[in-house]
């Protein structure tokens, strides 16, 4: 699997677990979800920077051993 997809899957799992915990504990569920989204924003920014770096620099062609 791609590293980017693994990160996304991991973040989704974290979100789901936090939402389940918020439901069990009751109370301000929306507030907890907002806090989770705030925590994830820097990670999303880092992923965007990585994708920009990859698209800007073309990958060198593999060397032919023939």
Swiss-Prot record:
Signal peptide (UniProt feature, chain positions): 1-22
Native organism: Lychas mucronatus (Chinese swimming scorpion)
Keyword terms of this UniProt record: Disulfide bond, Secreted, Signal
Localization (cell): Secreted
Tissue: Expressed by the venom gland.
Entry's Gene Ontology cellular component terms: extracellular region
Top-rank taxon, per record: Eukaryota
Protein's name according to its UniProt entry: Venom protein 27.1
Record's comment on post-translational modification: Contains 1 disulfide bond.
């Amino acid at each position: 699997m791609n590293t980017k997809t693994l990160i996304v899957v991991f973040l989704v799992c974290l979100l789901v677990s936090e939402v389940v915990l918020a439901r069990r504990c009751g109370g301000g569920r929306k507030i907890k979800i907002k806090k989770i989204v705030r925590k994830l924003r820097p990670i999303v920014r880092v992923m965007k920077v990585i994708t920009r770096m990859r698209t800007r620099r073309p990958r060198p062609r593999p060397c032919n051993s023939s």
